[in-house]
């Protein structure tokens, strides 16, 4: 362990950090944004924020299929983590969102239709980044 000093039988290491919160932890409103897909569910979007909402296009998504689109975002680093979920705009439980890949400046997001029928809805995908170094 770098930066360690023996102290009896224990070690003091300044790399350890603890965060205690008595209120919500999250991003300020200035770090959040929203964007809407223009022409199809596979159309890429750009939103340079650490958290936000992506309103997908209302085009049909066949049963049991996945669509992929690219989110271009200058706040994404290759060492970051992206969390996604469906927040509104679609049949509850019908969609499974996921991050297919993450590179500096962009993420490929997938949306799977988990139903037995085609859906023509505009689900809203919420996302938040955990920034890595």
Spans of features found by a protein language model:
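Glycan-recognition/cleft segments
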Residues: 93-102
């Amino acid at each position: 362990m770098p930066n360690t000093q023996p102290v009896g039988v224990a070690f003091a290491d300044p790399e350890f950090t603890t965060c205690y919160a008595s209120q919500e932890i999250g991003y300020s409103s200035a770090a959040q944004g929203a964007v809407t897909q223009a022409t199809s569910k596979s159309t890429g979007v750009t939103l340079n924020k650490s958290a936000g909402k992506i309103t997908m296009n209302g085009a049909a998504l066949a049963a049991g299929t996945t669509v992929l689109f690219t989110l271009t975002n200058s706040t994404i680093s290759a060492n970051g983590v992206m969390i996604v979920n469906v927040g509104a705009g679609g049949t509850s439980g019908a969609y499974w969102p996921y991050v297919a890949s993450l590179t500096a400046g962009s993420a490929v997001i997938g949306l799977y239709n988990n139903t037995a029928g085609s859906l023509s809805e505009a689900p809203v995908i919420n996302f938040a980044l955990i920034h890595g170094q």
